Amino acid sequence: MWFKNLTLYRFNKPFAVETEALETALADFTFSPCSSQDISKFGFSNALGKKGSSLVHSANNRHLICATKEEKMLPGQVIKEALEEKVALIEDEENRKLAKKEKDALKDEIITSLLPRAFSRRSQTRALILPELEMILVDSSSATKAEELLALLRKALGSLPVIPLSFKAPVESHLTEWLKNGSAPLPFEMQDEAELKSEADEGGIVRFKQQDLKEDEVLAHLATGKQVHKLALHFGQSIALLLQSDASVKRLKFSEEFRAGNDEVGTDDPMARLDADFALMGSELVALMHALVSALGGLEETQD
C-alpha cells in the first residue's frame, strides 16, 4: 500500500464527494476479470487489496482508491506469423492476392481464436484523494496510467475537474538554484544524484549518481547553461525521493524508522495495521505536499 511514485494533480473546484457517495459511484465500475474473448478489462477494486472489503478506504477525509487492469498477452510476432501463413494458404488456393480489408478480417479472426488461450497479466494503480489540499496523488511513474485511472474516476463521478500540478516558476529553475547553493530548502536535503540537461538540443544530458553534487565537476555544467531536471532528496527523516522537472516524484521510499511508527499496532489484525499504515502515510504525504509547494514557490493559479 505504501506509495512508490507520485504523479500529481489538483482540482479546479473543491472535491466535495463523501466516502459513501464515492463508494457507490465506483461500484458501478468494479473490476471483473477478462472473459475468454476480452482483450483487456479495467475497473475499481478493493482499496486495501485482498484483505480489504471496500472500494474506498478513508481516514481523516483522505480517500484511497485502486484500479485494476487485466490485459491478455498476445505477442505481435505470433499474430504476424499466423496471419502470413493464413494469407499465403488462401492466396495459393484461390490464385489471387488478398485485399487489405480481407487481411484485416483474417487478423481479427486469428486474435479471436488466440484470446481464450492467451496468458493475462494484472496491474494495479492506486490514488490518494486529498480534499484538504485539493489534490489527487496517483501512485504511478507513468502519466499514461495515471490518466487512465483519472478517466475511469471521471466516468464514475460524471465529472472530475483536475489538471496536472504546475508551479509559478519552472521546477527546474528551483532545482538548479538549489544545486548552485549547495542545499535545498528545509526540510529537504540534497542527496547524491542529479540529472542535468542543456536547453539547447545539441547540449546533451549529464547524469550523476553516488557523487557529491557540490563538487566543481558538477557545478561546471551549470556554468555552461545546463539545468537540473532530476534531483534526489530526503524529506526530513521519513522519505527519500527523486523530484523531476515535470513535478512528478519517482522512487518514493518511506524509511524503515518511519514505518516502524506503527509497530505497536502489531500484525495480529491485518486490517487494523493497514488502516494505521494508511493514516500514517496519508499524514506524511500531506506534509510532503505542503513542503514541496512552499519550496517550489507556490502553485500556479488555476482558471475556472
From Swiss-Prot:
<dbReference type="Pfam" id="PF04381">
    <property type="entry name" value="RdgC"/>
</dbReference>
<dbReference type="GO" id="GO:0005737">
    <property type="term" value="C:cytoplasm"/>
</dbReference>
<comment type="similarity">
    <text>Belongs to the RdgC family.</text>
</comment>
<dbReference type="GO" id="GO:0043590">
    <property type="term" value="C:bacterial nucleoid"/>
</dbReference>
<protein>
    <recommendedName>
        <fullName>Recombination-associated protein RdgC</fullName>
    </recommendedName>
</protein>
<dbReference type="GO" id="GO:0006310">
    <property type="term" value="P:DNA recombination"/>
</dbReference>
<dbReference type="InterPro" id="IPR007476">
    <property type="entry name" value="RdgC"/>
</dbReference>
<comment type="function">
    <text>May be involved in recombination.</text>
</comment>
<dbReference type="GO" id="GO:0000018">
    <property type="term" value="P:regulation of DNA recombination"/>
</dbReference>
<keyword id="KW-0233">DNA recombination</keyword>
<keyword id="KW-0963">Cytoplasm</keyword>
<dbReference type="GO" id="GO:0003690">
    <property type="term" value="F:double-stranded DNA binding"/>
</dbReference>
